[in-house]
Regions:
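Conserved N-terminal phosphate-binding loop of PLP-dependent enzymes in the Aspartate aminotransferase
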Residues: 1-457
Length: 457
């Protein structure tokens, strides 16, 4: 008997409605819209649902399926490891070879000075790990007042209590509040916060806002600044070139640790191995997940810089932190295979030199002068098309245009993501030019239909 029985789509949707709680979903709206789409298989850059529809996955699952669907190398790596050793912990002075090898390969690729790895299962866990290490570090350095964690509006750092607090998403804060000692500052989001100024001037102003917030909070109390190189789930917010050099100088001046959340940007998405490489960031920590296994199995890592690692190792004693699945051998084996494929197939370089520039050109040409498009922005294979709410009359609530357009995208056979009123593009790194053409064509068709519905021409 197969482990998953054959059922009609309607029956799957009924069981789903009866039993499954969906993340970031309004259950009443889901029911009113006819329930879930049941995705049954994937191949390359396409997924297929239980009704037989084929959709081009322009979001790589959830920003993670970098190598596309159906990679036999990853499936084989998981199977071989599950047969040899399906589980063992990294507690009690034990380890496994896949965890060691993946940690070694990671440290070969990460920015200089990051050479200690702690594994988890999700980006959220890696953020929590870093938070605990930061507080422990400052305690060991006899600066226990350094407890405040600074992040940015529209940031996304996971869904645990710490991650949701650090994130700059108001709907998440409304659900469970914000941890004491977490503060936020404006992001380098020129479309929303920019004035009549050059990108360079705006980047400096956004960076200066970080300094002003640190000074207002008291530098002797601020422990760390958390930031994504490019804010992905916040709407693909790409900072001006002047932003990151200034932010790093500010963090050094006030002795504030810098945490780069690479969960979306990592492993080639920006055209470099890490977003830190694209923006010349030298952080004290990075967090990774998602594409580390191309999404095939859950895995994350907190990669720790020498300064912090040295203190924790020399002064910290026994590390009172860990997860049952830290360094699980099967995901680590898939992670090793993923990194080797990224390198062997030159996908990082291809993103930087070929497919990334091609996607940019296609998007800019498709939406140049479009009456409903306010901005096209991005880097590598991470892009957004921001819809202009001001073009509609009457002015719709924020997010309404994005959701309307997203529904048309699904109808037209392409999976994207709407963040407020921005459509986000994050296809698998293996995408071909013809598939980029198809993705952009279907997105434009969806935006054109939205514009026609609201009378924008």
């Amino acid at each position: 008997m197969p482990p998953i029985p054959e059922r009609a789509s309607a029956e799957w949707r009924r069981f789903d409605a009866d039993h499954l709680i969906h993340p970031f979903t309004d259950p009443l709206a889901l029911a009113a819209g006819g329930g879930t789409r049941v995705v049954t298989r994937g191949e390359g850059v396409y997924v297929f649902d239980s009704d037989g529809n084929r959709l081009l996955d322009g979001l790589a699952g959830l920003w993670c399926v970098a190598l596309g669907y159906g990679r036999s190398e990853l499936i084989g790596a998981a199977e071989r490891q599950l047969r040899a050793l399906p589980y063992y912990s990294s507690f009690f002075h034990t380890t496994t070879t896949p965890a060691i090898e993946l940690a070694r390969l990671l440290c070969e690729r990460t920015p200089p000075g990051l050479d200690r790895v702690f594994f988890g299962c999700s980006g959220s866990e890696s953020i929590d790990t870093v938070v605990r290490m930061i507080w422990n570090y400052w305690d060991l350095e006899d600066q226990p007042r350094k407890r405040i964690l600074l992040s940015r509006e529209f940031a996304y750092h996971g869904s645990t209590v710490a991650g949701a607090s650090l994130g700059g998403m108001s709907n998440m804060h409304a659900m469970s509040g914000v941890l004491a000692g977490v503060a936020h500052v404006m992001p380098p989001y020129a479309y929303r916060y920019g004035r009549d100024e050059t990108p360079e001037a705006f980047g400096r102003r956004a960076a200066d806002a970080v300094e002003e917030r640190i000074l207002a909070l008291d530098p002797e109390r601020v422990a760390a600044f958390f930031a994504e190189p490019v804010q992905g789930a916040g709407g693909v917010i790409v900072p001006p070139e002047s932003y990151w050099p200034r932010v790093q100088e500010i963090c050094r001046r006030y002795d504030v640790l810098l945490v780069a959340d690479e969960v979306i940007c990592g492993f080639g998405r920006t055209g470099q191995w890490f977003g830190c490489d694209a923006f010349e960031i030298r952080p004290d920590f990075i967090t990774v997940a998602k594409a580390i296994t191309s999404g095939y199995l859950p895995l994350s890592a907190a990669v720790v810089g020498e300064r912090v690692a040295r203190t924790l190792e020399r002064k910290g004693g026994r590390l009172a932190h860990g997860y049952t699945y830290s360094g699980h051998p099967a995901p680590c084996a898939v992670g090793v295979a993923t990194l080797r494929i990224l390198a062997a197939e030159g996908l990082v370089e291809r993103t930087r030199e070929e497919t990334g520039p091609y996607l940019e050109r296609c998007l800019r040409e498709a939406f140049a002068g479009h009456p409903l498009v306010g901005e096209v922005r991005g880097v590598g294979l991470l892009w957004a098309v921001e819809l202009d709410r001001d073009a509609a009359s009457p002015l719709p609530p924020e997010g309404e245009l994005g959701l309307r357009c997203l529904a048309h995208c699904f109808d037209n056979g392409v999976v994207l993501r709407a963040v407020r009123d921005a459509l986000c593009f994050c296809p698998p790194l293996v995408i071909r030019r013809s598939e980029i053409d198809e993705m952009v064509e279907k997105a434009k068709k969806s935006i054109d239909r939205t514009a026609a519905e609201i009378g924008v021409a």
